[in-house]
């Protein structure tokens, strides 16, 4: 879990800082069941969400779900990344910063395993794989990243996460 404004690097050390009004909250939650691992992330804001923040949230949610919905068996990680680029370029957001070299991954026995969803990934996606899509946009002092997870079926991706809320969640202090 990270909260604050501006700096959402995964590698930051823990802090005693208290949650404050207008902080962005980013949570990445993992689990393990029957030797399989997975994770999902969600965001919220401590305070009222602005119209601009809601617009960004909605666009990131739409890009994420459209990318995952486009997955079919036989695609490579690069094919999925190409779909992500096409969806992102259709929005006001465009592509995220250079941190978006990888926007997703598989999971199973390990939390992060092939295929990587990246521009250079030649790894092939097969029916039965679990795929995570999580493009990360850092803007307006916050992080906008909603990780959605699906199992790949012969007909495409079937979401196995409860989709992120349509409205950017607010925690009123």
Briefly describe each language-model feature range.
Residues 1-173:
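Active-site neighborhoods and metal-handling regions in enzymes and metal-associated proteins
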């Amino acid at each position: 879990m990270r909260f604050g404004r501006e700096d959402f690097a995964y590698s930051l050390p823990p802090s005693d800082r208290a949650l404050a009004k207008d902080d962005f909250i980013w949570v990445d939650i993992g689990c393990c069941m029957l030797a399989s691992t997975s994770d999902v992330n969600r965001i919220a804001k401590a305070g009222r969400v602005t119209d601009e923040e809601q617009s960004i949230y909605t666009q990131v949610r739409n890009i994420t779900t459209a990318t995952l919905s486009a997955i079919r068996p036989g695609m490579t990680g690069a094919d999925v990344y190409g779909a992500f680029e096409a969806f992102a370029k259709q929005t006001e957001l465009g592509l995220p910063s250079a941190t978006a070299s990888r926007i997703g991954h598989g999971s199973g026995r390990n939390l992060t395993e092939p295929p990587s969803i990246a521009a250079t990934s030649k790894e092939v996606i097969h029916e039965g794989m679990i795929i995570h899509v999580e493009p990360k946009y850092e803007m307006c002092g916050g992080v906008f990243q909603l990780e959605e997870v699906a199992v790949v079926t012969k007909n495409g991706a079937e979401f196995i996460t409860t989709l992120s809320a349509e409205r950017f969640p607010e925690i009123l202090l």
